[in-house]
């Protein structure tokens, strides 16, 4: 049955924002501008953490990996979104193209969850167990955490994509979204959704709620350590360093939780798309801005890089 559907189903149709024609033009330019800023900002973070000796610590190593994920993440989604915004009609996407986009989307989303958790662990060890920092966060340990993040994403994506795209679909279904996200595609399956729905809910709990709980636990302990510091200046420095990561975590996990955990019965297609647009397009742009504006080391490295590029008088 599934095989027959796949051979007679050459493409899905992505609704995009074709039902909101008045917004398509303005949204096109906003998304394009945000995408360009995202590419520039994350590329700059990668460059700074690579060339600046002051940023060769585990914290900035994880930040560089996060920027790499953000670059791939937006590039998987935004170009097709721009094409959809430039068309007055739903755009076709092949069965294989939809599966590939979802696969990459899941790999990068899960990897980002794991990386944000690793960054919280880095801050916890640096502040609460400084004497063990070089041991617990050695280069080998950091590489292992990053490798595990990617491997976890690959395994999860392979499982979900295999389950979802083995289901039967009706002819030429319209996905009420601007990307091949898990829930909108899964809802279009004509039968056999139960196992995939259980898999998605399990993954949501494991990769959103558990990492978020670990991050919150880390920061509760960090807050206790900050309050125990005698020096006001030390407290401000530590809080400034941690607040950037906390803000990024709140943006990412907040919008992802609302999208995947809230009851679907009362949700609307427009609300789903707006929320997804925020965490897939807006958040990757905000991350480098947040880290640059709120982190003195990054700002200092940026000024130093600019001075080096200026021609001598």
Swiss-Prot record:
Keyword Membrane: yes
Glycosylated sites: 5
UniProt cross-references to Gene3D superfamilies, sorted A to Z: Rhodopsin 7-helix transmembrane proteins
Molecular function GO terms recorded: G protein-coupled receptor activity; olfactory receptor activity
Regions of this protein lying in the Extracellular compartment: 1-25, 76-100, 162-198, 260-272
UniProt cross-references to InterPro entries, sorted A to Z: GPCR_Rhodpsn, GPCR_Rhodpsn_7TM, Olfact_rcpt
Transmembrane segments: 26-46, 55-75, 101-121, 141-161, 199-218, 239-259, 273-293
Subcellular location(s) of the protein: Cell membrane
One cellular component term from this protein's GO annotations in UniProt: plasma membrane
Family, as annotated: Belongs to the G-protein coupled receptor 1 family.
Protein name as catalogued: Olfactory receptor 10P1
Originating species: Homo sapiens
Lineage of the species this protein comes from: Eukaryota, Metazoa, Chordata, Craniata, Vertebrata
Gene encoding the protein: OR10P1
């Amino acid at each position: 049955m599934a095989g027959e559907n796949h051979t007679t189903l050459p493409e899905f149709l992505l609704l995009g924002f074709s039902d909101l024609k008045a917004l398509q033009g303005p949204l096109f330019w906003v998304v394009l501008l945000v995408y360009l800023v995202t590419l520039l900002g994350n590329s700059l973070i990668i460059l700074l953490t690579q060339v600046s000796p002051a940023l060769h610590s585990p914290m900035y190593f994880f930040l560089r990996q996060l920027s790499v994920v953000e670059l791939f993440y937006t590039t998987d989604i935004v170009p097709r979104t721009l094409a959809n915004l430039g068309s007055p009609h739903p755009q076709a996407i092949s069965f294989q193209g939809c599966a590939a986009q979802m696969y990459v989307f899941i790999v990068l989303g899960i990897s980002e969850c794991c990386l944000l958790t690793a960054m919280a662990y880095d801050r916890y060890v640096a502040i609460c167990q400084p004497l063990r920092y070089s041991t617990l966060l050695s280069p080998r340990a950091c590489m292992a955490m990053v490798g595990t993040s990617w491997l976890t994403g690959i395994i999860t994506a392979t499982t979900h994509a295999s389950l979802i795209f083995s289901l039967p679909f009706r002819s030429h279904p319209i996905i009420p979204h601007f990307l091949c996200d898990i829930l909108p595609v899964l809802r279009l399956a004509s039968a056999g959704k139960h196992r995939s729905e259980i898999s998605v809910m399990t993954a949501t709990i494991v990769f959103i709620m558990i990492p978020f709980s670990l991050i919150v636990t880390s920061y509760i302990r960090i807050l206790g350590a900050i309050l125990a510091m005698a020096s006001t200046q030390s407290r401000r420095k530590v809080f400034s360093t941690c607040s950037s990561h906390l803000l990024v975590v709140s943006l990412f996990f907040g919008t992802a939780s609302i999208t995947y955990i809230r009851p679907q019965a009362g949700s609307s297609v427009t609300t789903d798309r707006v929320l997804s647009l925020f965490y897939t397009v807006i958040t990757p742009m905000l991350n480098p801005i947040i880290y640059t504006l709120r982190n003195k080391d990054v700002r200092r490295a940026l000024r130093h890089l600019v001075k080096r590029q200026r021609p001598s008088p």
